[in-house]
Amino acid sequence: MSIRSPFVVVMGHVDVGKTLLLDKIRGTSVAYREPGMITQHIGVSFVPWQAVERFAGPLVDKLRLRGKIWIPGFLFIDTPGHAAFSNLRRRGGSVADLAILVVDITSGLEEQGVESLKLIQSRGVPFIIAANKLDRIYGWKSVENRPFLFAVEQQEWHAIATLEEAIGKLIDQLSRFGIEADRYDRVRDFSKQVPIVPTSAVTGEGIADLLLVLAGVSQRFIPREKLSVSYGPAKGVVMEVKEERGLGVVADVILYDGVLKKGDVIITAGIDGPKETKVRMLIMPKPLDEMRDPEDRYMAVEEVKAAAGVRIVADGLDGVVAGAPIFAVWDLQDIQKVVQLVREEISEIKIETDREGVIARADTFGTLESMVLFLRQQGVPIRRADVGPPTHKDVVEAVLSRRKNPTYGVILAFNVKIPPEVEREAMSSGIKIIRGEILYRIFDEYIKWSQEVKTKTIEQILSQMTKPGKIQILPGYVFRRSNPAIVGIKVLAGTIKPGVTLVKDGKEVGRIMQIQKSGKPINEAVVGDEVAISIHGDIIVGRQIREGDVLYVYVPDEQIRQWLFQYRQYLRDDELKALEEYLKLRKR
């Protein structure tokens, strides 16, 4: 077995310099390579350790790392961001071995940075933080490609003070997520603290430090067996499926183990389940030294060994979804076994149950897995989760789910378009569709919407329930003795409304027909109000009820239980007092 280079993903908020940082790292690799040393990949940039040593020589010596690094180098995923990270999935973990979370040192951790951080944590991937835009620290004196440890020694005190303040703010932000972090040269225990490396993607300062810290973290925290590559059928993950002129539909794949050969049978997965096909062509970029014509950048190869990024040309790749596993089969007797393996793997991501919960949709297996994981962590139950745009069935399932809980009548759509006919059907069925490209925004919108639904639902329930109330007939304010009786009253506790039934000593005396205040009808009267009420019932004031009598609002038994055990918080103190007194009277 040989040792492969670890896969590294760069993540972070928009405009923090992820792409520029990647470009700087790639440029470093090209500039300091030995002739013929750089192997080109599809979707991946290889940075050999020898190039890092050449670039960061003085810092390598200062940190005493020369001769101690056994990894061949790094394989940087060319596309930064959480979508690429999500698609680098494998059963039980991630194909990504390391992550760099890029943060703008001048503004700290931002929204998508938080999303990236939680995604990294959910997959258990070791990571370091690049505190980028070091060149924007007020008063900072930049020198191109200088290591940070050497640069900081040459700065004025006010620039260092500004830097320390920015790093301190970032450390505080990270602590809110349970992460202990510090500037990398101050970290005492890398198993407990996350290193922060100040960098500038513009000047190249700190890039050397970043690569050396990455090497140290990789050797310390990535199990050697995870980086061991066997000579056997290839194992990989689909990163992108697209149509290429002259080739048809192709799949860009990351191989993390084994060997893939032209003519191999491969098993992967689409929306409808496992797919079997045969490799017609394997395409790799030409070596840099041979790349003369920009239009002639690629070449066909007979085989590719992991770890690598390769483009596969094969029949039947349309419908294959990014994030799907891909396995080569050398012994044809193993095909059904591998098909079952793929089926089991995607069934762990896709969800179809009769339980209560929301409907989840995402564009790839990777993003769906991240979405499901995140929703479960937030305590949101899922009834159905699948890859691709929402369908008629999703709307039907959402309607069924809503019957059990109104907040589950929703489709959460991550990175997918909504077909117009599905949108119309959802609207007519009263099903909410929340679509977005940032998972946390979808979740936040769902929480906001579900709270509105809960509030509206509770308001509807409460509007149909009878609130407790206690009144006293005011002496000298009998305006009519019967048919209906009209009297002046004071609300001693609770609330009264037209339509409620009044009781005296546990016996019903009549129903309030109307409430008037200052000669005008009102919808309700609350504690402290003095109003006139008309009472419909077989009563005469002076017989069944008298001046000075205390009457209570009749509350049905089921509603009493609801008020006490479900909606107690919606009762005012005086309403609760009226209910408790009413219960005591009933027990006499």
From Swiss-Prot:
Coiled coil: none
Positions of the UniProt region annotated as G2: 37-41
Chain spans, region G1: 12-19
tr-type G domain ranges (all copies): 3-224
UniProt GO cellular component terms: cytoplasm
CDD domains: aeIF5B_II (cd03703), IF2_aeIF5B_IV (cd16266), IF2_eIF5B (cd01887)
Annotated positions binding GTP: 12-19, 78-82, 132-135
GO molecular function, one term: translation initiation factor activity
Keyword set, alphabetical order: GTP-binding, Initiation factor, Nucleotide-binding, Protein biosynthesis
Pfam family, one: GTP_EFTU
Region (G4): 132-135
InterPro entries named in the record: EFTU-type, P-loop_NTPase, Small_GTP-bd, T_Tr_GTP-bd_dom, TF_aIF-2_arc, TIF_IF2, TIF_IF2_dom3, TIF_IF2_dom3_sf
Tree of life domain: Archaea
Function summary: Function in general translation initiation by promoting the binding of the formylmethionine-tRNA to ribosomes. Seems to function along with eIF-2.
PANTHER family on file: EUKARYOTIC TRANSLATION INITIATION FACTOR 5B, TRANSLATION INITIATION FACTOR IF-2-RELATED
Family named by the database record: Belongs to the TRAFAC class translation factor GTPase superfamily. Classic translation factor GTPase family. IF-2 subfamily.
Name used for this protein in its record: Probable translation initiation factor IF-2
Source organism of this protein record: Pyrobaculum islandicum (strain DSM 4184 / JCM 9189 / GEO3)
